[in-house]
Amino acid sequence: MFKKSLRQLLLAAAIFPLVVQPAMAHVIWFDYNKGEYDVLFGHPEDGAEAYNPDKFKSVTGYDQNKQIVPVEIKKQSESVSVIPQGDIAALTAFFDNGFFVTKSPGNSENVSESEAEKLNPDFEVGHFLKHTKALYGWSEVLKQPFGLPLEIQALKNPFELKSGELLPVQVLYQGNLLKNPTVEYEGEKYTIDEDGIALVPYVVGGFQPIEASYTLSLDNDPAADRLSYETSFSAERNSVPEPSALLGLSVLGLMAFARKQGKGLKSTK
């Protein structure tokens, strides 16, 4: 009885933040750096944190026609960078942040899948998966979805935005429109209208990555009670996939931010 009551309490404590602020979990995104694309982890408005590079699972590069461009993956002790072997117009990536068990309210611990299976009968366990999409060009094929499990879809060309204009975005789960995702930009949540659209404002200096999250309850998973997807979207002109990129700097890019490099790897969702 005690374990059941404790489990219910922890479940409520774990779900409450998802209701009032479900975008608290970290995201990944790309940051162009002298020919390489650093894979950053954290909250874009706060800066990046160190992470275990083994959690980075895959990356795909695309040219202007959405054909695959080979990429080299460089893993450092607490980060990953990607080097395209040609001009790219888009990058996507997948990061499995693993299982987190909540043993007390507000305190989560990163555990292995086998440990999660042992703990799950008595404690709330979540599995956190991260995806990201970065555009460096725009075309008829690039504006179509890339097939990410959770994906932010821009409904107009972000490179044509002017200061004060809004970028309409939708969030897709398994290719289908979500009506109730959490969309966040610079730490602020944005309202989703009846068509599943959020309007993200352009600000002088460009965009931070836009974030979205969606959480599912799991009934038959021995290791986790819920599956949490986090995804991000960014756009900037770093590669030169089309001649128009030579006309000037992009109106849409990542804002400069101070990276918070941790002294050690953190157990962060």
Feature map (PLM): residue ranges:
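Beta-strand-rich domain onsets/edges
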Residues: 26-36, 109-167, 172, 176, ...
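N-terminal signal peptide c-region/cleavage motif recognized by signal peptidases
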Residues: 20-22
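Glycine-centered loop-to-beta-strand initiation motif
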Residues: 76-79, 192-206
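C-terminal cell-surface anchoring/sorting signal
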Residues: 6-7, 245, 249-269
